[in-house]
Amino acid sequence: MNTGLEISILHNLEMSKLLDTINSPSDLKKLSLDELRELAVQIREELVNRVTLNGGHLASSLGVVELTIALHRVFESPKDKIIWDVGHQSYAHKLLTGRREQFATLRQHGGLSGFTCRDESPHDPFGAGHASTSISAGLGMAVARDLAKEDYSVISVIGDGAISGGMSFEAINNAGHLHTKFIVILNDNGMAISPSTGALSKFLNNVRFDPRFEFAKRNAKQTITNMPFGKAVWAFTKSIKRKFEKSMLPGSLWEELGFIYLGPVDGHNIRELEAALKRAKDFESKPVLIHMITKKGKGYDDAEADAVKYHGISPKSGGLKSSHGLSYSQVFGQTLHKIMSQNPQVVAITAAMTDGCGLGEIAAAFPDRVFDVGICEQHAVTFAAGMATQGYIPVVVIYSTFLQRGFDQIIHDVCLQKLPVVFAIDRGGIVGDDGKTHQGIFDLSFMSLIPDMVVSAPSDENDLQHLIYTAVNSGKPFALRYPRGFGEGAEIESSLHNIPIGQNEILVNGSDVAILATGKSVAFAKDALEILTESGIKPTLVNNRYISPLDSELVLKIAQSHKYLVTVEENVISGGLGSRINTLLAEAGLVNKIKIANIGIPDKFVEHGNQSLLRAKYGLDGKGIAQRVLSLVGNPNEMKHPQIICP
């Protein structure tokens, strides 16, 4: 017979294996409430351990553990479609949908994505990485289901930050109009929307959440409308109810938009969550919004105390390190701070990336001149355009991948009107572990095709500060694109000066071979020069800081005095620096007089992996550039340096 202590030990051993027993969502349905609570603890431990090793989005995933468990107990994934907005809070979802054994590879090259990915699992019905897409995608799936006369649930999970994006409201408006059966879960972690408070509010919402209330409401309507003048009485009663709700209830906005509102629900109470999800599942004729209150970073004290800091973290090992001290974002922030101190007409605008873009100290110093508009990139661009019409010089500070969302506004609202808006494009080029949705490899192409847009990419920190100064004083639409990570250790001059627009510079004079590199690629081209010099090749190296307008005079001069021309860029080749130079040489009739090679990203989406690995894979590091040059011109010292293998 087992003693109480032995039973306790056996119980603890069984509990310790809970996460290991979950191979699919169906396994969750066998667990008791106590076991589910223990499972939530184990999931959080796994998330903290793995994300601190691999890096990733921690606080968001910690906040939705109970929701993830409840979703997979109430619904039948992958038949039912669960869509995670942005996807960075889907780590627990990955653990519970058969990816536990692969979880150690999270955000590693060839491993699990840090976001949802259709290619990765049938439990990921929609890929993500950018915000505010889940409601549109979910509504599309729900309408497709109804057209095909199929039967499954569609659930979109969206945070209070992402729901501020304009695309979310477009989808909400459409969903209310269509009256499609569809569930939206609003994860309110207090970062953007204040939780409802007060005993009356809680009481009224509890009443409205109770199925008996819905039954009573239907019976009351039937009874009153069957009375003499009943329809008029019911209409009057309903109007009074709506006015009362509008002033007292947090759900009235959603009901006006055509949704049934349930909540607020404790997002860390599995029993409450399951009750809400089952209730929402029963509604047939309208979309339902469940308002869920959670704590971002739940279960990890450091993340709960500073959810912004722990939103995304770097790995303990293998993260970004530098002896140079300052990142490009920090140099940008310091330079803009100096400029704004001297010029009161300069303002900064960002879309929910104040700290990530280096604007934190500037916002503290100039709180009335730094505007965080939320996850609203389109609005950010046109808001900047409006300020520019009134004599201000707006600097829109934004990650490359998110700037894509404001492309029409850049053309229509800024460039067509020749407004002096500066676009400070952070995270240009290969960003690494966040993968396909976050690589900044298209900006040189889509910005360069716009008439009257100046497009530049600094070669180092010193180049960056002077280009910022040039942009602010240019009076033109001006884009400057800089990479993620630390600088090159360049000496930063104390005074700022203009760099003539369209003027590039020769860094090294050589012969026969000319390498025209832009941005971060200049540093790798310098590494390539060391290898090539050992091989008997002494190339010319150009810092091609301006992509548009091109320094046509310099390019043509080089083309006429060299046998080989190589372009290097961390951007898709199509439409980028290489394409623009190819076009220039073709128009000048020089393409048959010089051999050309374009080094850049091929026509594909770049997977996740650390920056060094990806640069090596795509031939963008020093060795890769040298190998490409050697394959173009041949190796005079091939026998002397057999370690260099040319493709």
From Swiss-Prot:
Family indicated by similarity: Belongs to the transketolase family. DXPS subfamily.
Record note on cofactor: Binds 1 Mg(2+) ion per subunit.
Reactions accelerated catalytically: D-glyceraldehyde 3-phosphate + pyruvate + H(+) = 1-deoxy-D-xylulose 5-phosphate + CO2
Organism encoding this protein: Dehalococcoides mccartyi (strain CBDB1)
Pfam families xrefs: DXP_synthase_N (PF13292), Transket_pyr (PF02779), Transketolase_C (PF02780)
Molecular function terms from GO: 1-deoxy-D-xylulose-5-phosphate synthase activity; magnesium ion binding; thiamine pyrophosphate binding
Name of the protein described by the UniProt record: 1-deoxy-D-xylulose-5-phosphate synthase
GO cellular component, one term: cytosol
